[in-house]
Amino acid sequence: MITWDMVKADESLLGAFIGQLSTYDLARMAVCAKNGWGMDQKGEAGRIFVMEKYGTPEFVFADGNNGVNLNEKNIGFPCSVTVCATFNEELAYETGTAIADEAKEKEVNVILAPAANLHRNPLGGRNAEYFSEDPFLAGKMAGNHGKGLEDHGVASCMKHI
């Protein structure tokens, strides 16, 4: 049996590790459920099912384009379109690093961000989540935001592409 600690020590074991998991275990991991389906009172987007037999850790997911979105106090950063209006890629990166620092403090492993959709209509209700109508600029800013998260130890899950 290959454990998670063995995979961390030797990443080449990842395929064999996944290959030993049952369809049920894989499905439970894919839907972000812990001890059943759904979310708990903390407000996170989900948790990956822990398999004690294999030593898999708990991964906590939260939305977070503009901060760590939980049912508790958090830092609210400027919306993505505001950050993008500066054309400052370093600012997008630093926003990601700051969100990562708060995520780690709140024991969140994965931030469901950045949102990388494009502005297609000025009346779009979710435009504040997206960086720009320009695909190149949106990609640069979203990429730097995500890199800031990941360089500081929090996984980034780009969405709304």
Name what the model sees in each region.
Residues M1-I161:
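Glycoside hydrolase catalytic-domain context in secreted enzymes
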